């Protein structure tokens, strides 16, 4: 495996808190559950948008047989309730995952056995109801819910419980599911390293020197020149990754043929959602174009525990099955789609270095995207969390390094490590990308390495309903769905955040679910509104997710060179505003460049490439120090810094990119910018179309030189060097070639008879010969003619000579020699300087007109002096294409808010920036530096007719439970001074005088008692009574009191008897008082001990 491969060692499903190594993937769900610290069992239920059970519902979670119909609804709602979790999933079909021509192929040992179109009906993405901006859901609904739920800073995984009860269930119900948090995953094996196989010369080097496969030191030899990259800009555009997904035979056997397809697509659905997050800084669409399920081993594909060898085999195999009859995004005649990257999912417990199980979960070449044999990855199946492994590995193919490896992400005070983290901890967020990952992929795409992702393949499109559900079902109906036909809404203030309903027991309750979007609402500032994303907004308005917009360009940076043509750059960011609530990332140019310091360097200055190579003289290479010179041979990238070790027979790439402004090749004005060769006009302006003519005159018409061409044949061989042709000083485009493949040798001689170059038999010829102010390129091989070429101009006259050997040569020569001044035509056409740009920003134009000039003094003369046949065409180019600074754009005043008396009128005031002559973009008000013009102003009309006036609302009556507020509505004169009969005002415009309200729950009915009445007797024991009534909180009679708590209405009482004083002073006679008839009872009940009874029944009680 190439040394640029990265290995993702993620333990089980995100592996939070990983200080361990995964030694094997879970082979059964029982093994997974035993490894969890905690999990819950839930029964997901198909519901409506309010969480109410569906009265009639199509089958949910039912395993679809081949050919069977499938649920094709674009919007679904599921309730997932467990002891400590409660989710209401709002799901929308994922139309962007599958290309329109995606197929599922089943392969046996002999190859493709059969195929069919893939079914995308099970793939959904969305959010929790009422939490669109803070939650994420990606699931498959075939055979149960398989997927991820992200909410409240926690990630949950859900999947059907294998072996659960199979009893009868309604069509809207499902079987038991396992719900567990990512943080509950654990594993006993410890190993913190994420292996990266690397070579010693690359250790400690910056990431940009290690992103692509490091080239080895190569011996000198014959190389062929690679074509240069075309001109590209740093542009944010939508990319499409057409993906081949392959599941090996162990995957098919483990998950079963009937379920493996939807299982794999559920994983890829999560992968696609990860790449759509705006934190990536680019719009990347993962599209599955081909799904291959292997039922048997393939003859040329070897998959084992050894990840490196398996990946090598898979990369070659997937390249071999690519159709060569397709072009771009066209579907080949054989119906097999091409792909940009290939993903292998295996049940093997893979390991990077050995054919035994260990902790490796994924492997992919870094920077391999769009390279046929390197855009591939192997991923171990560990459940739904395999999606994070696949996204991580595809990130590597985009040139991403691990967060914290060769970059600052993850360090203290820096951007935290995220999806590309080598080690996942509790603080790692694997659902977003770090700023380092964003920089890696942006650099990769801007360097032109992702060209295969620009074509847009056909995909399946769906039409979604647009009617707000709250308009179809009002709040009372939503309550009835949840709590029965007698339920209704019972609280009205915060209906958009929580819907409160009367339960069957007549209590006002809520399940914390907001009312459906579109439900009518009312606030202190909004008389009529509707609910939208848990907020009451003016009726009819629909706040949407905010798409990102470009911010202003930064000032131009420093020039990369002080002379010879450098580069200055300016950039902008997608932050005005940043994309929010699922808004799209910006499309367009993110970095621009311009030429600077185009003046020639002083004579004798060191070559710019030589200077960069020499800086590595003090850097050890494989433990030794070398003197480095520029390597000028072929077979290397034009904009990489490839240096030759002086005195040694090898060269190597010392930097992936030269400094901006370095010429791409000798004898060219094109320069390198950000590692790619960009076109430069002969005026040394980046992107200029100005070219040299055949005389090497910038913008010339070719009239300053003439072409000299001929064939020379000497009379006899062996007579020494013979003169072939004299080339005058100033000649350009010199070319000499031996047509007979003879053993002759070429030589150059100056005017002073000095031999500048001599080719002797048997002497190897160098490739580059700096002579006469230019560079001659000498090419000679056993199977090609000897040739000598130079771009020129030469600063001295030269004579071409030939030494003929056994065979007579035939030399073809051609060059453009300057025309003597007196031979020039007196007048000729020339381009005038470019006119001033027609606009200061947002795209203007410049024109370069043609004028007739005198050749002797270059003065302009009348056009008729020049020939009309040779007139040059007028030129035009774009200029000042950068957007204009933000400014306020003011609209016309509206009509007065009132047709009578004093009112206000308004106008639109928008901060916007002109991007081009035909496009303007609205910005946030803070982007405009000038004060905002007024939006409102007063206006005056005729006297107004009478109108309705309202007084303040009364208190809610009754004081508890459902009630009403009242207010007085009067017909008033326009000046509000007189009250008029109601008939003077328009009846249709009369405001409501009552409004429903609800303060609190009313207290229950209670028993009320009166004071106790008088005792029934005047002396002794008797009874007294009181009244007991059941009354409501309003004091009205009620029957709702609890009978068991009813107070008593009667109790015993005792009246004090008057004392009897006998006359006289003698001793009192002991006798019973005649009027007391109960003395026998006093004796019977032993009351004689009491003073009263002893006195009244003295005789009876005597002696007792």
Swiss-Prot record:
In what residue span(s) does the Disintegrin domain sit? 460-546
User: Region Spacer: which residues?
Assistant: 706-818
Residues where Zn(2+) binds: 392, 396, 402
Compartments where located: Secreted, Extracellular space, Extracellular matrix
| Cofactors named for this entry | Zn(2+)
Q: Which GO terms describe its molecular function?
A: metal ion binding; metalloendopeptidase activity
Tissues where this protein is expressed: Widely expressed in adult tissues.
Q: Keywords, A to Z?
A: Cleavage on pair of basic residues, Disulfide bond, Extracellular matrix, Glycoprotein, Hydrolase, Metal-binding, Metalloprotease, Protease, Repeat, Secreted, Signal, Zinc
Do you know which Gene3D superfamilies this protein is assigned to?
2.60.120.830, 3.40.1620.60, Collagenase (Catalytic Domain), Thrombospondin type-1 (TSP1) repeat
Q: Domain named TSP type-1: which ranges?
A: 547-602, 825-885, 888-943, 944-1003, 1004-1058
Summary of the function given for this chain in its UniProt record: Metalloprotease that participate in microfibrils assembly. Microfibrils are extracellular matrix components occurring independently or along with elastin in the formation of elastic tissues.
Per the record, a Pfam family?
ADAMTS_spacer1
Instruction: Summarize what the UniProt record says about post-translational modification.
Output: Glycosylated. Can be O-fucosylated by POFUT2 on a serine or a threonine residue found within the consensus sequence C1-X(2)-(S/T)-C2-G of the TSP type-1 repeat domains where C1 and C2 are the first and second cysteine residue of the repeat, respectively. Fucosylated repeats can then be further glycosylated by the addition of a beta-1,3-glucose residue by the glucosyltransferase, B3GALTL. Fucosylation mediates the efficient secretion of ADAMTS family members.
Comment, domains:
The spacer domain and the TSP type-1 domains are important for a tight interaction with the extracellular matrix.
Protein's UniProt name: A disintegrin and metalloproteinase with thrombospondin motifs 10
Question: PLAC domain: from which residue to which, for each copy?
Answer: 1066-1104
Per the record, the gene is Adamts10
**Annotated catalytic residues:** 393
